[in-house]
Amino acid sequence: MARVTVEDCIDKVDNRFDLVLLAAHRARMISSGSQLTIDRDNDKNPVVSLREIAEQTVSPEDLKEELVHSLQKFVEVDEPEQDTVPLIGSAGASVDADDTEVALERMTEEELLKGLEGLAPPEEQPEEDE
């Protein structure tokens, strides 16, 4: 990059590193087909972008915003949450409350033994080779 062009831009963009980022982004935009705001004069895209910044035909603030948007891969959209969704802590408490309300049928040992006598053991099946 031509030193004269960088020196011309320093009063428009205070930080040299920011200037390089903005000029490189503008040069990429020019390479991808963006309209030039000044005559090319047989200069390459980085020099043209620096001349555009120096002559204030493009705004450094707009370039910075476009640079940030070009680097974003995911745009987060804030959506309001539904109020009807129960909280995890309150859901656990309601499950415990439901467990205590269930009435279990009590069986005596004799009733259990009678029920087990009626069950037939499963028949053993010979193993078949596949």
UniProtKB/Swiss-Prot annotation:
- What protein am I looking at? DNA-directed RNA polymerase subunit omega
SMART domains in the record: RNA_pol_Rpb6
Which GO-annotated molecular functions does the record name?
A: DNA binding; DNA-directed RNA polymerase activity
The reaction(s) catalysed by this protein are:
RNA(n) + a ribonucleoside 5'-triphosphate = RNA(n+1) + diphosphate
SUPFAM superfamilies registered for this protein in UniProt: RPB6/omega subunit-like (SSF63562)
Listed GO CC annotations? DNA-directed RNA polymerase complex
Biological process (GO) annotations held by this record are: DNA-templated transcription
Q: Which Gene3D superfamilies match?
A: 3.90.940.10
The family classification in the record reads: Belongs to the RNA polymerase subunit omega family.
Primary role: Promotes RNA polymerase assembly. Latches the N- and C-terminal regions of the beta' subunit thereby facilitating its interaction with the beta and alpha subunits.
Q: How does it assemble?
A: The RNAP catalytic core consists of 2 alpha, 1 beta, 1 beta' and 1 omega subunit. When a sigma factor is associated with the core the holoenzyme is formed, which can initiate transcription.
Q: What is the lineage of its organism?
A: Bacteria, Pseudomonadati, Pseudomonadota, Alphaproteobacteria, Hyphomicrobiales
Signal peptide location: none
EC numbers? 2.7.7.6
Show the segment(s) annotated as Disordered: 110-130
